[in-house]
Regions:
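Catalytic and substrate-binding clefts that recognize carbohydrates or anionic sugar/phosphate headgroups
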Residues: 1-157, 167-168, 173, 180-185, ...
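Catalytic core of carbohydrate-active enzymes
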Residues: 60, 73-75, 376-377, 382-398, ...
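Short, hydrophobic/amphipathic alpha-helical packing segments
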Residues: 64-68, 81-84, 177, 285, ...
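Short helix/loop capping segments that flank catalytic or ligand/cofactor-binding pockets
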Residues: 77, 96-101, 109-112, 141-143, ...
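Extracellular structured ligand-interaction cores
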Residues: 82-86, 95-97, 105, 128, ...
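Short acidic-glycine loop/turn motifs at beta-strand connectors
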Residues: 89-95, 260-261, 569-570
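N-terminal small/glycine-rich loop or linker at the start of catalytic domains
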Residues: 149-166, 261-276
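Aromatic- and carboxylate-enriched substrate-binding clefts and catalytic-loop regions
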Residues: 189-496, 531-532
């Protein structure tokens, strides 16, 4: 059961697609007080949700702030990341369980046992929002109700489930060719190569650097013949430059965000001084979306949207203030106080809260200050592209994912999990974030494999891949100035080729589970508590996940170990993928067991009575035979497997037309 409550005059977000009558609020399990909505937490209750965030799957014990933030510091004391996903679930999951969605584009704080260990408090900055309260018997039921409320998740083309290689940056066409050639030379499967900001002419959206990519169109076609898709980045700011067509059009038509005086608001990002397209304005959004056609016409069929929280390096106003203040500091004998005052001032230029309250949007017939609608910018940028694809290539699936997001954007594109680091803790965070994002509708997602920032080690990249072969978005990405982590650069290339090859063996299952989750509004990545709610031990496990209902994964997230302790919630059989072969290994009884997991092997744990389909693999998704499958199972009574298969390219995707039963 879902109830809708309206407080004040909410700003519409288009997050919800299902029409509901509103009710008058009365206190129940959630109580409305002066400082927000409160829920008394019982000792055995779990709090799930909040999508892209730090810490565990169970969100108890911290204060989270929904405020899309350009924040690469994904640490335990971080309150906000790139997404604003205002959905939580609370309860024991086997009796009455509650879901709550706060629909507002401004800042929302979720204090989940932080101030008071037994209290959950949700507070908003303004008394203008909608609350959707869901009551159901289980976690899975709550998720399904919520997902039906917010609409079907984005469906990517099947080639986008292959392995992708990225780097900030591949600076030339020849470097792209070199990457492709090295993967081919070492027999490592690959389906995509990503182009970061240096493919552009001086970081200008929808341009090509013809000095470095003189034959861009030929490069796209050449890669396509190798079954490799090029996926360029698009940023949220448009360079302020006379003679640059996109800027000239935007300025002439009034499509940029304005300051309080009605002038274009000028900020700095990669190209220097820029303007933000008013993504919330219908005409500006259509105009910006139309620009993607420039690259589509060059053969591009995938994009990633970045810097769309939106990130602000500086504003003209704050930069001027800093320069003036620096003149004063030059004359000082800086002591501990004035020195850190100076460094704090300089550091505060970037993503300054005052800047976010200094420009305006035209949205649904009204003028809003940006901070009131901040969490919609990345969502509507991605929506602009998706709606343009519907206009220009309506029957074709285009890969599209974003850094910033709000619930509702899940209908238009996926997300990657932002600028993580090459830390083992960020591998663990990737594991824990997957189900939280699924709860909020984001199915096409994954982290930068190996970590974006910092220097990766060979064992970290390999262990990360052992988990990431299960995530829909499988992309190795790293930052300029860090160690190169294309897998052919490491000592044991054969292990990387083998692990990436596993992705193509298990792809029929991964794709099938993804499509069923999207079309049925269910989870692809399940915490153990979703399947074993009455098992007190399963409810506490956070580093093992079910992919669908048939198989469990338990990734190794520690350095210098050859295995790990696994909790088996029931009797399960171990399948080991190594050297292209699947070994049906040991059967584990319910309980804790230590499992050997040597580096370079992938381990799947199959439930008794269930099937797991495996293909022969391939060097790209196009090579995989989705019909020639070997079915693995154990036990006497085996349930048929609901296998989803479509053409992977068009928008002909319905359960009724594309599911069939596989049996031993």
């Amino acid at each position: 059961m879902v109830r809708k409550y309206i407080f004040g005059e909410p700003i519409e977000t288009d997050a919800v697609v299902k029409e509901l009558a509103s009710s008058a609020w009365s206190d129940g399990v959630f109580q409305k007080k002066e400082d927000g909505f409160h829920y008394s937490l019982k000792e055995d209750e779990i709090v799930y949700g909040l999508g892209e965030n730090v810490r565990g799957i169970n969100k108890r014990g911290w204060r989270y702030i929904s405020n899309c933030s350009d924040n690469p510091n994904h640490c335990e004391n971080t309150n906000s990341l790139y997404g604003a996903h205002n959905f939580i679930m609370v309860g024991d999951g086997v009796h009455e369980t509650y879901g709550l969605f706060v629909d507002t584009p401004g800042r929302v704080t979720f204090d989940i046992g932080y101030t008071d260990i037994d209290d959950l408090c949700i507070s908003m900055e303004e008394e203008n929002y909608k609350i959707y309260l869901i009551e159901a018997a289980s976690y899975r039921d709550v998720v399904k109700e919520f997902r039906e409320l917010i609409g079907r998740s984005y469906i990517a083309p099947r080639w986008a489930f292959g392995y992708g290689q990225s780097r900030w940056s591949y600076d030339t066409a020849d470097e792209v060719r070199e990457v492709a050639a090295e993967y081919k030379k070492h027999n490592i499967p690959i389906d995509s190569i990503y182009l970061d900001i240096d493919y552009m002419e001086r970081y200008k959206d929808f341009t090509i650097n013809r000095d470095s990519f003189a034959d861009f169109e030929e490069l796209v076609e050449e890669m396509r013949k190798e079954n490799i898709h090029l996926v360029p980045i698009i940023d949220g700011g448009v360079k302020k430059e006379d003679g640059y067509g996109v800027y000239e059009e935007g300025k002439a038509n009034g499509y940029f965000c304005k300051d309080e005086n009605g002038e274009d608001f000028i900020i700095g990002v990669w190209p220097g001084k820029c303007c933000f397209p008013d993504m919330l304005d219908d005409k500006a959004r259509q105009w910006f979306g139309d620009k993607y056609r420039i690259l589509i016409d060059k053969g591009i069929d995938g994009f990633w949207n970045d810097m769309n929280e939106p990130a602000i390096f500086y504003s003209e106003k704050h930069l001027k203030e800093v320069f003036e203040k620096m003149e004063d500091y030059k004359k000082m004998n800086l002591d501990v106080n004035t020195f850190f005052e100076m460094t704090g001032m300089i550091g505060g230029i970037c993503n300054n809260p005052e800047d976010y309250a200094s420009f305006y949007h035209n949205y649904k017939g009204r003028r809003y200050r940006h901070d009131q609608v901040h969490n919609l910018f990345g969502y509507y940028m991605t929506r602009s592209a998706s709606e343009a694809f519907e206009r220009y290539v309506p029957e074709k699936r285009i890969l599209l994912f974003s850094r910033a997001s709000y619930i509702g954007m899940h209908r238009f594109g996926g997300i990657w999990q932002g600028d993580n680091a090459s830390w083992w803790s960020h591998l663990k965070m990737n594991v824990k974030m997957m189900p939280s994002l699924n709860m909020c509708g984001f199915l096409y997602t994954g982290a930068d494999v190996g970590g974006f920032g910092a220097d990766a080690t060979e064992d970290l990249v390999l262990r990360w891949l052992e988990f990431a072969v299960f995530t829909p978005l499988l992309r190795n990405h790293s930052a300029r100035g860090t160690r190169r982590q294309e897998v052919y650069r490491f000592s044991h290339v054969e292990k990387f080729a083998d692990v990436i090859g596993v992705r193509y063996q298990i792809l029929p299952y991964i794709y099938s589970e993804y499509m069923k989750a999207a079309l049925r509004n269910t989870m692809m990545f399940n915490p153990l508590a979703f399947l074993y709610g009455e098992d007190a031990l399963a409810r506490q496990v956070e580093d093992q996940l079910f992919i669908g209902e048939n198989v469990m994964v338990a990734p190794v997230c520690e350095q210098n170990v050859s295995g790990r302790v696994v909790y088996f919630p029931e009797r399960m059989k171990q399948l080991i993928f190594k050297n292209g072969i699947v070994e049906e290994a040991k059967v584990y009884e319910k309980g804790f067991s230590y499992v050997e997991m040597p580096m370079g092997t992938v381990h799947i744990f199959l439930r008794e009575g269930y099937l797991f389909p495996v293909a022969k693999g391939g060097k790209c998704v196009e090579d995989v035979d989705f019909e020639d499958l070997k079915l693995y199972s154990f036990g006497e009574e085996i349930k048929p497997y609901e296998y989803y298969l479509d053409d992977g390219e068009t928008k002909d995707f319905t359960i009724e037309s594309h599911v069939r039963m596989l049996s031993c």
